[in-house]
Design a protein with these regions (language model features):
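A short secondary-structure junction motif
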Residues: 51-66, 92-99
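Short, compositionally biased strand/turn segments
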Residues: 7, 20, 58-72
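Catalytic cores of DNA base-excision repair glycosylases
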Residues: 37, 71-180
Length: 180
């Protein structure tokens, strides 16, 4: 079994120190925040993946509100329980029809033993991304975020995330958005 270096308090500090040495803009941000920056993390497995799908192309506040309402409907937050909820309830909670279809499809794949999210923990990053993006509703952003937030992989980064691109633009004082 491959052993991966995972995000924890020690590796977060190492990463901050590395960034502060390499990039003055990061150093300034880290010092302004007194290095008190919480990592982006989610629960591993079904709940984390569904949370990321809800977040696709939404503001953080909107996504959190919708997912909070979904968690009231789905107790416990399992694929089986998810599938037992009338899809109209998810629509009332603010989830789009398309995302309801994506989430239901993922839940069904898990219930039918066609998707094993636990097995992803032991796979290389590229393999995890490859397997996830084969699933309807999951693109590179979601797969990269799953690696970073749910599996806590250190070298995962959702490079196409508009919020991160704009933050880098501001930090570097760039006129134009950087490309990836």
């Amino acid at each position: 079994m491959t052993k991966f270096k995972l995000l924890n308090e020690e590796t977060l500090k190492e990463g901050f120190d590395f960034l502060a040495k390499k990039e003055p803009g990061f150093k300034k941000v880290l010092e302004e925040k007194n290095y008190a920056i919480n990592p982006f993390t989610k629960k591993e497995g079904f709940e984390g993946l569904i949370s990321l799908i809800v977040e696709q192309q939404l503001s953080v506040a909107s996504a959190q509100a919708i997912f909070g309402r979904m968690k009231i409907l789905v107790k416990p937050f399992t694929p089986e329980k998810f599938l037992s909820v009338n899809p109209e309830k998810f629509k009332e909670a603010g989830l789009s029809k398309q995302k309801i279809d994506y989430c239901s499809g993922i839940a069904k794949k898990i219930v039918d033993n066609e998707l094993d999210l636990k097995a992803l923990k032991n796979k290389e990053d590229a393999q995890v991304i490859k397997e996830l993006i084969e699933i309807r509703g999951i693109g590179e952003w979601t797969a990269q975020c799953y690696l970073m937030a749910c599996l806590k992989r250190l070298d995962a980064w959702p490079y196409s995330d508009l919020g991160l691109i704009v933050a880098a633009q501001r930090m570097k004082g760039l006129k134009d958005r950087p490309d990836y």
